[in-house]
């Protein structure tokens, strides 16, 4: 197999990268009826597999799970989750031949082996679905010509897919049809129905392409979503304790500070997050973010270039073939950081304190979101896709750190995301070491001591305008408006 993206002409590449359309609510009036009577078999029962399946069953669909023989005979975690939730579980040979729709929700690393195993068993004219297109785009998996291939990619971890559905809402979702595999011309109808069954249509659906999803997803998770959050936690903690702050308090300030400040990001973008700071702190955080962007821009651009040209995938797959030596080494190194090893702290910190003392955290988040967004858009990815893969998902990942530190984040994200995160962090931490060492305790985690809120009016206006006019803020305001409207519709029902 060879990288599918690299087989396309420049015109085809740009066309696929730039494919992105926010779908109208009326396009989902038929809900999931198109696949209502289908036999739907999910391959794998991890976080996405289980939670998507629960949502789809609650939407009235016929769902069962197929697992490897060893997973069934040894009653592994995937078997336990499926059976404990009352689903039919069977082997590939038992369930795949009767399936109208097969959802491949195994870990990225297992996609080739899973699809290779199930494809010969799939009946003529069946549909194969993914929630991430890495196997198609980067590994170049060739699917039988009679099989329709679609993608439905919720823009959050699997647990959140379920929780939002239970609240009567859903999570923004990207759908796509593989242009090489739509023999009956009904791929889009299938993808729409699948997305509706998971609750995605309640939050907003983007019609995109496999290529745009993969390239933007890889960039987001490597840089702002995981890499910058981990870098902020590791470097921030190291410098705070070096300047005399209690290790446990520093851990709490960062662990929950990342969650609190990105919660502000979720509701009103970078503008709202920055507005939670005092005027002097806002200007300081803005200036720090600009300095960080100068240092980090070449690294972000390198990651984007490596993703677009396939070098990242080749490097990661070489590590797969080498028994994950690099990934496991970086995972072990992360566990040994002072942030991860520090004890818990029971000192109360108010919501506003996290902002007041989080100037460094806010600057890192602002710089990371804007750099990731810009790198994607500069590569031909449409701004809506870039928004979802940068700003939108950041609070969801920060929630994982709040639950159980960096370990939780790296367990919940995909194997592909974990590798990319370590790759970025491994470069970013030494790159920022001198810069963070030059910061004062006020900048890092104590907050400004001056009581005056006085600033130069012209400078404040200039900073506010720069924050609000960035591309991620412009498209973000529009997309959050769509989601708010849709949430009202869902609540009314």
UniProtKB/Swiss-Prot annotation:
KARI N-terminal Rossmann domain sequence ranges: 17-208
Q: Which PROSITE patterns does the record match to this protein?
A: KARI_C (PS51851), KARI_N (PS51850)
Record-given protein name: Ketol-acid reductoisomerase (NADP(+))
The chemistry this enzyme catalyses reads: (2R)-2,3-dihydroxy-3-methylbutanoate + NADP(+) = (2S)-2-acetolactate + NADPH + H(+); (2R,3R)-2,3-dihydroxy-3-methylpentanoate + NADP(+) = (S)-2-ethyl-2-hydroxy-3-oxobutanoate + NADPH + H(+)
InterPro entries the record matches: 6-PGluconate_DH-like_C_sf, 6PGD_dom2, KARI, KARI_C, KARI_N, NAD(P)-bd_dom_sf
* Enzyme Commission identifier(s): 1.1.1.86
Q: Which GO terms describe its biological process?
A: isoleucine biosynthetic process; L-valine biosynthetic process
Active-site residues, as the UniProt record annotates them? 132
| Entry keywords, A to Z | Amino-acid biosynthesis, Branched-chain amino acid biosynthesis, Magnesium, Metal-binding, NADP, Oxidoreductase, Repeat
Highest taxon of the lineage: Bacteria
Q: Which residues bind Mg(2+) 2?
A: 217, 389, 393
UniProt source species: Colwellia psychrerythraea (strain 34H / ATCC BAA-681)
Provide the top EC class: oxidoreductase
Q: Which family does it belong to?
A: Belongs to the ketol-acid reductoisomerase family.
Pathway assignment? Amino-acid biosynthesis; L-isoleucine biosynthesis; L-isoleucine from 2-oxobutanoate: step 2/4; Amino-acid biosynthesis; L-valine biosynthesis; L-valine from pyruvate: step 2/4
Query: Where along the chain is substrate bound?
Result: 414
SUPFAM superfamilies, A to Z = 6-phosphogluconate dehydrogenase C-terminal domain-like (SSF48179), NAD(P)-binding Rossmann-fold domains (SSF51735)
Q: At which positions is Mg(2+) 1 bound?
A: 217, 221
What is written in the cofactor note of this entry?
A: Binds 2 magnesium ions per subunit.
- List the Gene3D superfamilies: N-(1-d-carboxylethyl)-l-norvaline Dehydrogenase, domain 2, NAD(P)-binding Rossmann-like Domain
Q: Which residues form the KARI C-terminal knotted domain?
A: 209-353, 354-486
